[in-house]
């Protein structure tokens, strides 16, 4: 239409801005805990700009720039604008994305094709499908139209196994993790770290069992045939998404507290094992008393 003179670029941009406004008509009422955890009017309507096609050719075009400009104009939460960047991304496109970042509205999110495409291949996607990935929800990459991706299948607290190392797997008198030994007897950081990994392995195994049970329940009790009709190869296989009909099937738990866990492990290594500034006995006592919070000095 623009080439034929039926539409000016300015009016086309205005139409795009109107779509952005319309996307914010939706809202979701949440309970108090969810509202706190998902604050910011997030509905996870993710939209991708830039990137490459299945043949490895850059697909950045005028519409890519207009998407960024729309977010700059309306300054609204939706859509969750993401940009795919790689070695073939036009410099002008990266500058435009940076201009949106500079506004401070938290958009766009940047996704590195050079890392994500190989990671998807490692999970069984063909190179062509991996190149054609998009982002769903907040941060999860997948090949749309071919994937049953159960994202946010669980929230895994990365710090919880570390806490259990100090109690030999006991919580409030109940043995909920493996017995990894008395933490005060761990003479090296490697011993401590091995105990942490053992606690994590045990907890993750429980998580996998729970997610698998839910998957089976969904397949048996809550199949979604209409949704299956829009995803390859459900019809060909005669299975719904929940029964494994899609070309790719993934369950994606989220790891939470990664930075806190890394900080905690480093603090233990540095202060207890490397510099001997605190004993493991004193650290354990400090943790058990929440560093003295709420305790009377007398």
Indicate residue ranges for each PLM-predicted region:
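Conserved catalytic cores of very large enzyme subunits
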Residues: 1-298
């Amino acid at each position: 239409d623009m080439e034929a003179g039926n539409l000016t670029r300015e009016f086309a941009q205005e139409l795009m801005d109107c779509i952005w406004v319309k996307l914010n008509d939706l809202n979701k009422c949440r309970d108090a805990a969810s509202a706190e955890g998902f604050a910011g009017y997030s509905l996870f309507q993710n939209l991708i700009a830039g990137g490459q096609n299945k043949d490895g050719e850059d697909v950045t075009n005028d519409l890519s720039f207009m998407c960024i400009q729309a977010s700059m104009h309306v300054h609204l939460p939706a859509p969750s604008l993401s940009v795919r960047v790689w070695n073939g991304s036009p410099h002008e496109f990266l500058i435009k994305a940076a201009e949106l970042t500079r506004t401070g509205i938290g958009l766009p999110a940047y996704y590195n094709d050079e890392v994500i495409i190989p990671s998807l291949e490692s999970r069984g996607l063909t190179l062509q499908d991996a190149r054609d990935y998009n982002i769903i929800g907040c941060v999860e990459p997948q090949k749309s139209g071919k994937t049953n991706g159960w994202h946010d299948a669980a929230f895994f607290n990365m710090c919880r196994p570390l806490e259990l190392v100090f109690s030999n797997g006991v919580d409030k008198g109940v043995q909920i993790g493996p017995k990894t030994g008395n933490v005060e007897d761990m003479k090296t950081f490697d011993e401590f770290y091995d105990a942490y990994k053992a606690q994590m392995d045990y907890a993750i195994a429980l998580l996998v069992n729970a997610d698998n049970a839910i998957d089976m329940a969904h397949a048996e009790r809550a199949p979604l045939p209409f949704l299956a009709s829009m995803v390859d190869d459900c019809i060909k296989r005669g299975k719904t998404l929940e029964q494994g009909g899609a070309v790719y099937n993934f369950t994606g738990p989220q790891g939470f507290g990664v930075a806190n866990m890394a900080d905690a492990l480093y603090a233990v290594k540095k202060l207890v094992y490397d510099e001997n500034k605190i004993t493991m006995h004193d650290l354990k006592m400090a943790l058990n008393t929440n560093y003295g919070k709420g305790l009377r000095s007398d």
